[in-house]
C-alpha cells in the first residue's frame, strides 16, 4: 500500500472467502504485524476480513527504523501512523465482500491508541479491542462522547501499570457492554495470546456479539451507564479553576473507594505541566500534590511539584521538594534508569540555583 505521503507500507490480508465484517489489527512497538498472525487466521476462519499492517519504521514497511531514532525524531515518525492506519483501512473496505458498516479495530500497546483514533475518524468502526496500552486525550474524549461503542480491554498484572491503565481507560466509556479481562502473569500486548490460550477465542466471541450480530443502529444515549468516577473527576479537573473541587473528589474517593484509580501518574503529570504552560501555577500545584499523594514512591512526582512551586515564586517549597526528589530516587525501583538520570539532573540543577540565590524566607 501507499501512505498519503508516498511511503510504501506492507500489510497482510486474511480473506474468509465470503462476505463478512472487517477487522484492522495494529501491532505493538516491540513487534510487527506478524504478532497478530494466529489471531488473524482464526478470525478469518470465522468469517472476518482481516488486515494487519506494519507501521512505517517497522517490519517490512518503509521508513527509518523507529528504535534507531532519537526520541524527538521518533515522535515525528509516529505522528504519521494515523495516515498509515487509514491507508490500511481504505484498502480493507475496498475489498469485495467486506461489510463496510461492520468494522472492528484492535490494538496492542502503542497500537491501542491508534485503534481508538481509527474509530474516531471512521464511525463504521463498531467496536475496539485494546491490549495493554494507553489512549491519548483525543481518544479518551471520543470514548466519552461515544457510549454506543463497546470496548473490550485486556491486560496482565505482571505488566507494570498496564492493567490499571486499561481499567482507567474504560472509565472514560459509558457503554454497558464494556469488559475488562484481567490476567495474572500473561505478559504484554499480543504476548498474552501464548500465555492465555482463552484470550483469542474470547476476542472472537466478542466480535460475534458486538460486531457480527449487533444491530447497526446505535444505542441511544439513555442506555449508557452513569458517568464513572474517572469521568466525573476529569470533567471537574479540566474546568477553569476546577483543581480544588477535583481534589475534594480525589480525597473522597481515597476514603471510600481505594481500589479506584482516578488518574495514572503520567496523565496527571502531563496535565499539571499543561497548566504551568498556561501560567496557572496555583492549579498546577494542586494537581502535582495529588500526584505525590497517589504515587509517593515516584521521584518524578516530587520533581514536578518542585517545578510548580518554583513557577509560583515559592522558593522554599521548591527547594524542599527538589531535595525530596533526590531522597526518593534512592528507593525508586519503577522509573527507568535513563529517566531517573534526567530527574536527578533536574532536581540537582534547581537545588544549586536555589541555594546560590538564597531561599525566600518571607512568611
Language model features: what each stretch is:
Residues 147, 152-155:
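Short beta-strand/loop motif that positions the catalytic acidic residue
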Residues 1-16:
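N-terminal cap/lid segment of alpha/beta-hydrolase-fold proteins
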Residues 43-66:
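Conserved alpha/beta-hydrolase
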Residues 87-148:
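Primarily recognizes the serine-hydrolase "nucleophile elbow" in alpha/beta-hydrolase
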Residues 20-28:
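Short beta-strand element of the alpha/beta-hydrolase
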Residues 29-41, 55:
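The serine-hydrolase catalytic nucleophile loop
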Residues 177-236, 258, 346, 355:
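C-terminal catalytic histidine-bearing segment of alpha/beta-hydrolase fold enzymes
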Amino acid at each position: 500500500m501507499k501512505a498519503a505521503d508516498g511511503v510504501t507500507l506492507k500489510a497482510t490480508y486474511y480473506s474468509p472467502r465470503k462476505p463478512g465484517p472487517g477487522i484492522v489489527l495494529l501491532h505493538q512497538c516491540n513487534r510487527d504485524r506478524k504478532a497478530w498472525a494466529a489471531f488473524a487466521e482464526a478470525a478469518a476462519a470465522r468469517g472476518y476480513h482481516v488486515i494487519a499492517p506494519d507501521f512505517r519504521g517497522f517490519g517490512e514497511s518503509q521508513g527509518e527504523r523507529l528504535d534507531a531514532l532519537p526520541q524527538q525524531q521518533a515522535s515525528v515518525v509516529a505522528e504519521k501512523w494515523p495516515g498509515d492506519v487509514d491507508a490500511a483501512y481504505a484498502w480493507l473496505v475496498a475489498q469485495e465482500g467486506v461489510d463496510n458498516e461492520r468494522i472492528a479495530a484492535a490494538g496492542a500497546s502503542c497500537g491501542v491508541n491508534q485503534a481508538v483514533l481509527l474509530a474516531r475518524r471512521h464511525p463504521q468502526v463498531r467496536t475496539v479491542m485494546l491490549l495493554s496500552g494507553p489512549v491519548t486525550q483525543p481518544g479518551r474524549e471520543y470514548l466519552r462522547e461515544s457510549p454506543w461503542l463497546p470496548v473490550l480491554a485486556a491486560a496482565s498484572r505482571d505488566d507494570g501499570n498496564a492493567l490499571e491503565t486499561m481499567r482507567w481507560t474504560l472509565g472514560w466509556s459509558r457503554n454497558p457492554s464494556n469488559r475488562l479481562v484481567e490476567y495474572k502473569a500473561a505478559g504484554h500486548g499480543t504476548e498474552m495470546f501464548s500465555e492465555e490460550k482463552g484470550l483469542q477465542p474470547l476476542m472472537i466471541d466478542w466480535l460475534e456479539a458486538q460486531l457480527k450480530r449487533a444491530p447497526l443502529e446505535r444505542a441511544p444515549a439513555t442506555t449508557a451507564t452513569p458517568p464513572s468516577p474517572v469521568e466525573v473527576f476529569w470533567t471537574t479537573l479540566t474546568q477553569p479553576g476546577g483543581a480544588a473541587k477535583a481534589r475534594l473528589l480525589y480525597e473522597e474517593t481515597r476514603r471510600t473507594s481505594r481500589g479506584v484509580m482516578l488518574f495514572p501518574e503520567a496523565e496527571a503529570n502531563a496535565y499539571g505541566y499543561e497548566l504551568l504552560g498556561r501560567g496557572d501555577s496555583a492549579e498546577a500545584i494542586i494537581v502535582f500534590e495529588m500526584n505525590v499523594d497517589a504515587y509517593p514512591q515516584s521521584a518524578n512526582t516530587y520533581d514536578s511539584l518542585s517545578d510548580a512551586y518554583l513557577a509560583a515564586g515559592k522558593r522554599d517549597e521548591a527547594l524542599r521538594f527538589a531535595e525530596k526528589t533526590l531522597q526518593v530516587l534512592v528507593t525508586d525501583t519503577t522509573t527507568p534508569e535513563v529517566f531517573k538520570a534526567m530527574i536527578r539532573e533536574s532536581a540537582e540543577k534547581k537545588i544549586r540555583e536555589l541555594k546560590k540565590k538564597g531561599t525566600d524566607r518571607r512568611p
